[in-house]
Design a protein with these regions (language model features):
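A contiguous active-site-proximal alpha/beta segment in oxidoreductase catalytic domains
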Residues: 225-227, 232-308
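Structural recognition of the beta-strand scaffold that forms the well-ordered cores
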Residues: 92-95, 164-168, 186, 204-205, ...
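Contiguous beta-strand/loop segments that form the cofactor/metal-binding neighborhood of enzyme cores
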Residues: 65, 75, 79, 267, ...
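N-terminal glycine-/serine-/threonine-rich beta1-alpha1-beta2 phosphate-ribose binding loop
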Residues: 32-224, 240-252
Length: 443
């Protein structure tokens, strides 16, 4: 049995909430995008990219949790000069799931003590055949002999928190990050780390989607503050559970959604709410993903578990099924048991600006179509339309999501020399387009 079977007592959801049917899955993904933690904590930025922002002290972090709104930030100069923070004032941060996205987040919080060697974002699951008009990405890149090349703006070292501990189920896959922080304590089981390391103040969760909720809940129950990567959880029930638990425990929490606070996203919000393109009644969002296996495939046959992998902890609350390397390291996104597909991966980014700009609440209708799928893999391609009622002085609006090679129709008014971007807003006075993370909006 999976070692996290005990979580069944936490997440005893009605069967209809755990339904794997496509239409329900699309509705669930909308909740991934829409439900944020009630407590927003900006000391660990949503983009995790502002390397030169002012530091905050551990004493203040711990002393103002009960009044998070009154939290203050102390300039570096007060703590010992530019770029310096006393070690005793550093928040002790633990990273959980650091082989990929989580490792990038950690590096954006503190410069590695040892230069980190380059490794790909993807894993074995990125190796696939062309499908639905999508070309497979280049072969998996592995750790090279050369350190990551940084631009002049990135060469300055920084440390916004003390990387106190790092936890990953696969110390081979995450080895480049573990080696970069030799002083951090190393674990493969997040429960053991949280139980033993009482000095940990906060955790950063960058694991596969299916373990976000159980790890966040375990940390909050232990009094640890939580930053969890998007999607916050995998089901509606889990998001509500975490929301309520955050209130009960009083810890500060944040869901990471890279792009939410970049200039481009805010520019789009200002344009739309300022009426620059008039009333918006139609929005089209799309991505070229999945870049991993999705569709009508059989689950790969089980093979022996390698010694470097703590597979029980990787499974977490998921069904106890045989191991195969084609399910891990980025490829998990395409399986119902572990991921949320192309929409759950990129939709969280691309939906963000329209939800904010158009004050979207709950849809009144969802219509979805897809290519064939089965009990193991999400569909290769899908098209989902959400219908929202009028909101104040904003008219009803339809928001359509497409992936797996499906794109929206090109508007007649779009100039021939302009490419169709990943987000398209159609107003009665004009158009707005921007990229997946709200990047570079254009009128």
């Amino acid at each position: 049995m999976p070692c996290l079977a005990f979580v069944n007592s936490w997440f005893t959801a009605p069967p209809y909430i755990r339904s794997r049917c496509f239409a329900r899955g699309s509705e669930v993904v909308f909740y991934y995008i829409y439900f944020f933690f009630d407590f927003k904590f900006n000391t660990m930025s949503n983009t995790m990219s502002d390397k030169n922002s002012v530091n905050f002290t551990r004493r203040e972090f711990l002393g103002t949790v009960a009044a998070a709104a009154a939290f203050t930030i102390v300039p570096r100069s007060v703590l010992g000069g530019p770029g310096y923070t006393a070690p005793s004032d550093m928040v002790n941060l633990a990273g959980i799931g650091v082989g990929s996205q989580g490792g990038g987040d950690i590096q954006n919080i503190a410069t590695p003590d040892v230069p980190i060697k380059r490794r790909s974002f993807g894993g074995g699951g990125m190796l696939m055949q062309p499908y639905a008009g999508i070309q497979p990405p280049r072969r998996e890149r592995r750790a090279s002999d050369n350190p990551v090349q940084m631009g002049d703006a990135e060469k300055q070292s920084f440390k916004h928190a003390n990387i106190y501990a790092l936890c990953d189920v696969d110390h081979d896959y995450s080895g480049h990050i573990l080696a970069g922080y030799p002083k951090a304590k190393k674990y493969t089981d997040f429960r053991e780390m949280i139980d033993k390391e009482k000095e940990i103040d906060a955790v950063l969760i960058g694991t596969p989607d299916h373990t976000h909720a159980v790890i966040a809940a375990y940390a909050m129950k232990a009094g640890k503050h939580v930053f969890v990567e998007k999607p916050m959880a995998k089901t509606i029930y889990e998001t509500r559970f975490l929301r309520d638990l955050a209130k009960q425990t009083g810890v500060v929490t944040q869901m990471g959604n890279q792009g939410h606070n970049i200039e481009g996203t805010m520019q789009t919000v200002e344009w739309i709410q300022g009426g620059v393109i008039g009333d918006v009644r139609e929005v089209h969002l799309w991505t070229n993903r999945p870049m991993w296996r999705q569709g009508y495939f059989d689950r790969p046959a089980g093979v022996d578990i390698p010694s470097n992998l703590n597979y029980d902890v990787w499974l977490g609350p998921a069904p106890d099924k045989p191991y195969n390397p084609e399910m891990l390291h980025f490829a998990w996104r395409g399986l119902w048991d572990y991921g949320t597909g192309a929409m759950g991966d990129m939709g969280a980014h691309t939906f963000d600006a329209p939800i904010w700009a158009l004050n979207l609440g709950m849809p009144t209708k969802i219509q979805a179509t897809s290519t064939p799928y089965n009990k193991d893999y999400l569909p290769q391609s899908e098209c989902v339309t959400y219908e929202f009622p009028a909101r104040g002085n904003m008219p009803p609006v339809k928001v359509t999501w497409s992936d797996g090679g499906i794109k929206p129709a090109r508007p007649a008014e779009l100039e021939p020399n302009r490419q169709l971007r990943e987000a398209l807003y159609i107003g009665d006075k004009g158009l707005i387009m921007h990229g997946t993370h709200g990047a570079e909006p254009q009128l």
